[in-house]
Structures are given as structure tokens and as C-alpha cells.
């Protein structure tokens, strides 16, 4: 999965897909009551990027729905995963539940259309800190109450704050979640980061019977050398400001027979087992 990073303006969606991304990550900004208002990152953000691009959250969902609905004039078959970077760290933890209800409802109304020809992409809920775990409970509760639990099959969970992997597992156990789990490891592209935690996450993913990580990705990679380093370790995905650089690296002899771009036919919740 090549994840385009910080794709917050509607016009950036096609721009990043044209560069080779098959997944996009966008920031979801909340008001103080936990209502999702905009796709917006704000200052500071990654080096060399504009931090201020934004869209109204519901309008953004309307657009990506069209891009991921077969038969729609705007359909792009390559876009298979949407990662919502939920800016819950900006609001009180007490509002995490309200935020989960709001995001689930808006996805039902604007993306899935409650079953009426909605978008088909998989959804990854990127949660910054384990203390905001009530968001997940609220999200699942809302799908159940609204009679649309079928969408759980399309939704995955990912804690992105580089917290202790065992703490993350404990929270997932408390929530009763043991599938559809990704694990991110990374830092803003402005700073270097070692591979110690990334290696630990990959080790857990590859441990037979370990359920709490099915995919691991590294973020936000801009240098080809760091992309190569991550691929050698065996990541499932790379988040980048420059998807075209990832595409180029994947074509190199060392990687071209080991990796390929994920398509809609690839299940993002299953561990990859090499043949």
C-alpha cells in the first residue's frame, strides 16, 4: 500500500493517485464537542508541505465516495484504502466517544450511503493515542444501532502515536478487538527515526497466532534510501509525500519480484504469507 500523506484538499485526491498512491491519508479536525468539521492538518506539518489545505469533511467524503464507486464518472480503481487521521489529541478525551458517533454517522450518510451505492474502499481509523480508545467503541456502537454492522468488514484500527506495543494490545483486548488491526510506526518527515520499534511491530505481526497486528507501515518517508530500508524489513505499506518515489523504488530489481501494488482484491486485514 502506497499511502499518500496529508491529502486534505479535494483537488489533491486525484493528484496523489496520479503520482501512484493506491491509498490516501487525510486529517479529520474536530470542534470542541467532537464534531468532525474539516479535513485539515494545520501548523506545524511536514517539511516542504503546505499545512493549511482543507475541505469540509462531509464534502470530502462525498468526493472520495465518487472516486471509489465503480460506474461513477470519477471512479479510480486504484484507490482502495482511506486512512482517516483522527486529530483526537486536539480535543478532550471525554469527547472521544462523541467523535466516534459523529464520524461513523457521517461515513454512513456521505460515504456508504447506508447501502445505496456507496464507496467501496477500505477504511482505516488512525487513532493518535490509546487514551482515545472510546472512539472505537462509539464507532462500532453507532454502526450497530443504525443497523449497518456489515460495514465493520470494511473498517480497520490503527494507533499511530508510537506508543508501547503491549499497551496497545491491552487496549485492543479491553475493546474486544483482535482483527483488522494495522500498526503504524514513524515520525514527521523533518526528523530521522530509527527502526527499533518498527522491527518489534514486524516481529509481532510475524508471530504465529498473534492477532493484534495484521499489517505494518512506516511513515512519513520521503528519502528513497529510507523507503528501501523499510521495504527490506518487510513492511506492508509506506506513507509518503511523494508516492512516485515509492513507485520508482518498487521497480528496482531488489524489490520488483518481492512487492507489488495492492489492488481491491487484496484483503488489508489478512496477514500476508509469502508463497
From Swiss-Prot:
It is an enzyme of class 4 (lyase). The lineage of its organism: Eukaryota, Metazoa, Ecdysozoa, Arthropoda, Chelicerata. Binds 1 Mg(2+) ion per subunit. It comes from Sicarius peruensis. Dermonecrotic toxins cleave the phosphodiester linkage between the phosphate and headgroup of certain phospholipids (sphingolipid and lysolipid substrates), forming an alcohol (often choline) and a cyclic phosphate. This toxin acts on sphingomyelin (SM). It may also act on ceramide phosphoethanolamine (CPE), lysophosphatidylcholine (LPC) and lysophosphatidylethanolamine (LPE), but not on lysophosphatidylserine (LPS), and lysophosphatidylglycerol (LPG). It acts by transphosphatidylation, releasing exclusively cyclic phosphate products as second products. Keywords: Cytolysis, Dermonecrotic toxin, Disulfide bond, Hemolysis, Lipid degradation, Lipid metabolism, Lyase, Magnesium, Metal-binding, Secreted, Toxin. The keyword RNA-binding does not apply. Its cofactor is Mg(2+). This is Dermonecrotic toxin SpeSicTox-betaIIA2iv. SUPFAM superfamilies: PLC-like phosphodiesterases (SSF51695). Its EC number is 4.6.1.-. Belongs to the arthropod phospholipase D family. Class II subfamily.
Amino acid at each position: 500500500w502506497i499511502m499518500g500523506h496529508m491529502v486534505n484538499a479535494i483537488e489533491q485526491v486525484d493528484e496523489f493517485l496520479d503520482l501512484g498512491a493506491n491509498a490516501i491519508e487525510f486529517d479529520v479536525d474536530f470542534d470542541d464537542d467532537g464534531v468532525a468539521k474539516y479535513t485539515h492538518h494545520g501548523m506545524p506539518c511536514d517539511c516542504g508541505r503546505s499545512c493549511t489545505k482543507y475541505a469540509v469533511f462531509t464534502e470530502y467524503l462525498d468526493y472520495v465516495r465518487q472516486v471509489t464507486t465503480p460506474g461513477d464518472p470519477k471512479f479510480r480503481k486504484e484507490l482502495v484504502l482511506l486512512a482517516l487521521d483522527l486529530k483526537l489529541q486536539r480535543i478532550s478525551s471525554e469527547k472521544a466517544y462523541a467523535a466516534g458517533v459523529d464520524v461513523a454517522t457521517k461515513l454512513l450518510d456521505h460515504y456508504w450511503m447506508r447501502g445505496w451505492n456507496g464507496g467501496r474502499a477500505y477504511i482505516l481509523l488512525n487513532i493518535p493515542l490509546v487514551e482515545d480508545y472510546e472512539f472505537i467503541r462509539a464507532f462500532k456502537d453507532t454502526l450497530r444501532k443504525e443497523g449497518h454492522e456489515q460495514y465493520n468488514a470494511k473498517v480497520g484500527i490503527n494507533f499511530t502515536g508510537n506508543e508501547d506495543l503491549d499497551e496497545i494490545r491491552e487496549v485492543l483486548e479491553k475493546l474486544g478487538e483482535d482483527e483488522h488491526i494495522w500498526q503504524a510506526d514513524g515520525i514527521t518527515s523533518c526528523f530521522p527515526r530509527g527502526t527499533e520499534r518498527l522491527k518489534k511491530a514486524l516481529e509481532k505481526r510475524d508471530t504465529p497466532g498473534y492477532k493484534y497486528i495484521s499489517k505494518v507501515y512506516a511513515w512519513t518517508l520521503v528519502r528513497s534510501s529510507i523507503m528501501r530500508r523499510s521495504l527490506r524489513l518487510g513492511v506492508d505499506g509506506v506513507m509518503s509525500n511523494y508516492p512516485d518515489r515509492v513507485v520508482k523504488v518498487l521497480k528496482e530489481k531488489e524489490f520488483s519480484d518481492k512487492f507489488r501494488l495492492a489492488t481491491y482484491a487484496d484483503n488489508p486485514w489478512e496477514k500476508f504469507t509469502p508463497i
